[in-house]
Amino acid sequence: MKNIIFNIIIFSVLYNLLFVYNAKADSRLEYCEPYREQIIAILESEGLPSEYFYLAVCESRCKIDVVSNKGAVGLFQVTKPTYLHYKPSHCSKDDIDDLECNTRAAARYIKHLQHRFKDMKTLVKAYNRGGTNLIRKGSTREADGLSYCVMSYVKKYSTNKSNKIKTK
């Protein structure tokens, strides 16, 4: 029952945060198509709904080898410390750019964030900024005082969700 309620909350938060971002969202989704089923299968095997696929769309445009200026790597833009903490035991410390290892580490981190942040808006912002950084900013309930970049992240995420490629 909790999972059904959480999935409904995910959908409503994303639906209610729609902004005009359609052209970019469409191109991101097209680029992600070859990896979509594999990413969704991994997320679901880790106990997460398929909607978290859209984090990879927003974070990296599904580019496996992309590295941010902050050093975050791969599909889900996982930092090295986060990867090392949440990676599966069969993944080496150097597999951060591997599709499966990056996705599994991200999924495990998301599950950790679900326990810390009860509403979806804050969870998505915490994923982008880091849970500890979000808490340092003060109000995690509304994520007050966050940069424009992080605030627009939720807009990108929600728009990509609204243009979702049908899953199963």
Model-derived regions, located:
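Catalytic glycan-binding domains that act on GlcNAc-containing polysaccharides
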Residues: 26-168
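Classical Sec-dependent N-terminal signal peptides that target proteins to the secretory pathway
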Residues: 1-25
